[in-house]
Amino acid sequence: MNLNFMISKDVLQGPWAGLPVAWKKDLSFDEEAYRSDVARTCAAGVPGVYTAGTTGEFYAMEFDEWKTIARVTVDECRCAGTPVMIGVTSTYALGAARRAAFAAELGADAIQVALPYWMDIDDRMIIPFFQEVTEACPGMALSIYETRRTKKTLTLEQHRAVFDCTGSYLAVKSNEGTLGCSPKGCEQLSEFVNVWVGEDNWNALGPYGAIGSASALVYMNPRVILKMFDLLSRKQWNELQPLTDQVKRLIEQGLRPFAARGFTDTGFDRLMGKASRFLTMNVNSRGTYPSATDEDVFALQKWMQENTPELLLL
């Protein structure tokens, strides 16, 4: 594997912006609005941008749409000089490998991939899967999207085996219920890969090595979230705590009415980005899952003005 041009582990740190896709009213791709929001996010100074995660609705687009959106994302990030990662998750290994090869062709810096999620993955399939995907994009950094939605969470030994066999595994997005979201697991993983957790966990897991996030909050308020990462980097835990508390309050209280209505990742994340007026794209997301509305944006704005006003100050 040729790793001569692979980005360093240090690049995959901080709040990488996992942007939603801009859709028109008819739910076709709104390239103009999307380019504008990617460019604005890059200009805000984020350490990196990625697309085709859950917020980016990789599961709700055709392969040709995915290719167009990936190309546009890389194009805008290259113009801005911002590192870029493309999500390549698929229901089958060849699908992920084809996406990884296309991301390499575009010149992306990294790929993010979860295990295939339709049928259960046997432990014996894990290493061959990551080998097949990374062999399709030699020289590109790998970030694992670890989530219980795939019906399989990795052990420390499996993470280490992926690290050893690929030579490109640099970061893991650790979600609730996975190894990196516990203090001990975060500390163990941080010995060889960067661990990303939600900003609401930075104060709890930063002391154990957490060093970034797959962030929806950074395009809600880049000023606050980049300040939080600076405090995390300098291990200023007392100063970080009040900001972490605001983020937790927003997630646990401000978003509660929308969770009760069945919102999922992209619904929440569009809503927050629109509430602060940082994102310009339409708030609509594709079904089957509930989509936020303009009325929802106004409702969250009102709640934030009363409860977390600093998060609205761009």
Q: Which functions belong to the PLM regions below?
A:
Residues 41, 103, 205, 273-276:
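Hydrophobic alpha-helix position signal
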Residues 34, 66, 70, 96, ...:
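A general structural signal for well-ordered alpha-helical segments in protein cores
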Residues 2-151, 288-289:
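Active-site beta->alpha loop and helix N-cap motifs at the rims of alpha/beta catalytic domains
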Residues 2-4, 16-20, 44, 224-314:
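C-terminal alpha-helical cap/extension of soluble enzyme domains
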Residues 10-13, 215, 219, 263:
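Alpha-helix N-cap/helix-start motif at coil-to-helix transitions, marked by capping-box chemistry
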Residues 132, 136-138, 147-258:
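Catalytic alpha/beta core domains of metabolic enzymes, predominantly
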